[in-house]
Regions:
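N-terminal secretory targeting modules
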Residues: 2-103, 107-164, 203-206
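Long hydrophobic alpha-helices with heptad-repeat/coiled-coil character
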Residues: 47, 249, 264-265
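Short amphipathic alpha-helices and their capping/turn segments at secondary-structure boundaries
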Residues: 85-101, 188-204, 244-253
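Structural motif
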Residues: 99, 209-211, 255
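Short hydrophobic segments within beta-strands
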Residues: 103-104, 174, 259
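Conserved SGNH/GDSL esterase-like catalytic core that processes O-acyl groups on lipids
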Residues: 118-239, 245, 263
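Aromatic-lined glycan-binding groove of carbohydrate-active enzymes
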Residues: 254-265
Length: 265
């Protein structure tokens, strides 16, 4: 095993053990700072190997990447933006959405989307994540933001590159690997804070779409450590209501996509 690979493996273990330290406020500021530094170094090191020509060829040969949709394929955009900004979500059209954000776990973070080996699984390809990735266009990466960009080219908030939540390229995609419903309140506050600090976003005027895709780690992992599984369900329900109330209080003109965990695993 190469020395570089050994270092990366150690850092990946730290990533799993200290994931909650990164996603929530804590008193251990020095530990957080050191961990973030190591995590970013490992991330950058691995990202170089994903982007090389050999790995890109493997992705194409294995069918892991979408085939490019030629421009000859029509994409009609008639009647997809309101003449006047709607006051009600019930009259909202695709072109009316100005801002998009994503809250969730590894699926939202785009973990391992371009992986060809186990080491690559730790990379977070947010730019091509289905709910909040906007790299390229729908012809190359069919994501929700890329579809909405056809109707509103000024759409903002989507992630643009392979990145961590610490990177500017993640924008309003704040998904974190291994997150559970208990992480939603903090991630929601982060989204609200980033929106309010973004000069491109008018909180009162712009329509915003926030997608939640979280819960499998609660129901496929955490629930196994509870004597009464109903406690996990009740906790998830309580925290979900909490974040919906927080969004309602802080983000007017917001439509929420709530993607439930699969009924069968």
């Amino acid at each position: 095993m190469k020395h570089r690979d050994l270092v990366v493996i150690v850092l990946l273990h730290l990533n799993v053990m200290l994931r909650s330290v990164v996603t929530r406020p804590a008193e251990l500021d020095s530990l957080i700072g050191n961990f973030r530094h190591f995590r970013m170094e490992a991330f950058n090191l691995l990202n170089e190997t994903v982007s090389d020509e050999q790995n890109l060829r493997l992705l194409k040969q294995s069918g892991k990447v979408q085939r490019f949709v030629r421009k000859k394929t029509p994409c009609p955009l008639n009647n997809t933006k309101s003449a006047q900004t709607p006051e009600s979500v019930h009259k909202l059209r695709p072109g009316d959405i100005d801002v998009i954000a994503g809250i969730g776990d590894s699926l939202t973070a785009g973990v391992g989307l371009l992986a060809t080996n186990v080491m690559h699984v730790s990379l977070e390809h947010r730019g091509i994540a289905v709910t909040a990735g906007g790299k390229g266009s729908w012809r190359k990466y069919l994501t929700l933001p890329n579809m909405l960009k056809n109707f509103n080219p000024n759409l903002t908030g989507y992630a643009t590159e392979t990145s961590l939540t610490l990177h500017n390229e993640s924008h309003l995609n704040v998904g974190e690997t291994a997150s559970m419903s208990e992480d939603m309140p903090y991630m929601t506050r982060v989204v609200i804070k980033r929106m309010m600090e973004d000069d491109r976003i008018d909180i009162k005027k712009h329509w915003k779409m926030v997608t939640f895709m979280i819960g499998p780690n609660d129901f496929c992992s955490q629930i196994c450590f509870e004597n009464d599984f109903q406690k996990t369900l009740d906790k998830h329900r309580k925290e979900l209501r909490q974040v919906l109330a927080t969004l309602k209080q802080n983000l007017p003109r917001t439509i929420v996509n709530l993607i439930p965990p699969p009924m069968q695993i």
